[in-house]
Regions:
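A short helix->loop->beta-strand "cap" motif at the edges of active sites that frequently abuts
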Residues: 76-79, 101-102
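Rossmann-fold NAD(P)-binding glycine/threonine-rich loop
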Residues: 71, 84-104
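Short glycine-/small-residue-rich Rossmann-like dinucleotide-binding loops
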Residues: 61-62, 85, 191
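A generic structural signal for well-ordered alpha-helical segments
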Residues: 19, 73, 96-99, 128
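Hydrophobic, well-structured mid-protein blocks that either form specific transmembrane helices
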Residues: 98-99, 103-142
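Rossmann-like NAD(P)-binding element
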Residues: 49-68, 78-81
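C-terminal substrate-binding/catalytic lobe of Rossmann-fold NAD(P)-dependent oxidoreductases
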Residues: 10-48, 132-247
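Conserved N-terminal Rossmann-fold NAD(P)-binding element of oxidoreductases
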Residues: 4-7
Length: 247
């Protein structure tokens, strides 16, 4: 499977390393604004320079590159794994529209553990809510992360919103001078140090608290998930796939 990697930051380098180690993948090039002379693959500054056709693009870059990636993918019928966070509503709509022509996987978190957490939430969130439990999401990341709350925190909220319906996300309680409403789900972000990523869902009821927590101990969990998504797209002609629909 010919892979074109978009983005060569910390995550991109880890993805490239794993791709080189696996026989089922052929890393044909890397698109990055910063060239790395030590990289054994061809380095490109943009997609227009790429001559070989890729079977799949794995994107760990920036939302600003979306239009170029979709244009290349639609032209070459290339599948895309979007593992980038921070897409706007308009950009997500573009991804959905493009998926009518090509196969796309999009997730803010590609780890298997988060996939399991979302499955658990689909089973228990509504029951907790219906029995009067308050729901809060807390996420922690390193001090270099730009977006807040994290895409994964938004994903966890969306999973519960689908099950419960009628919920309202609350990102900042400092401006609210009223009691907590039942339909609210708080989403809070902490930034500091070198935390890879930690997400906690709290169900607070009368005299008891239940917590579901996922902690990433290295970025490798996201790499493995992205490669698994690329393999899963092999037999897909078109469509928009997520952790819920692909596995």
């Amino acid at each position: 499977m010919k892979v074109l990697l978009y983005g060569y930051g910390l995550m991109g380098k880890k993805v490239a390393h794993q791709l080189r180690e696996k026989d089922e993948f052929d890393l044909i090039g890397v698109v990055s604004y910063e060239f790395d002379e030590k990289a054994p693959e061809a380095m490109y500054s943009n997609l227009t320079e790429v001559q070989d056709r890729a079977d799949v693009i794995i994107d760990f870059s920036h939302p600003n590159n979306l239009d170029d990636i979709l244009a290349y993918a639609k032209k070459n019928k290339t599948k895309v794994v979007f593992a980038t966070t921070g897409f706007s509503k308009e950009q997500l709509d573009k991804i959905e529209e493009a998926s009518k022509e090509i196969a796309i996987f999009q997730s803010y978190n590609t780890s298997f553990g988060i996939q399991m957490v979302t499955k658990i939430l689909r089973q228990v969130a509504k029951e907790f809510y219906d029995n009067g439990y308050d729901i809060e999401i807390l996420e922690k990341h390193h001090n270099q992360k730009i977006d807040a709350p994290s895409g994964t925190a938004k994903l966890l909220y969306e999973v519960m919103e689908d099950e419960i319906q009628g919920t309202t996300p609350v990102y900042d309680r400092s401006s609210l001078h009223e009691k907590r409403k039942k339909e609210e789900i708080g989403i809070q972000a902490l930034r500091g140090g070198t935390i890879f990523g930690e997400h906690e869902i709290m169900f607070a009821g009368l005299d008891e608290i239940i917590e579901i927590k996922h902690t990433a101990l290295s970025k490798d969990v996201f790499v493995q998930g992205a490669l698994a998504a690329a393999k899963a797209l092999q037999d897909k002609e078109s469509g928009l796939f997520t952790l819920k629909t692909l596995y």
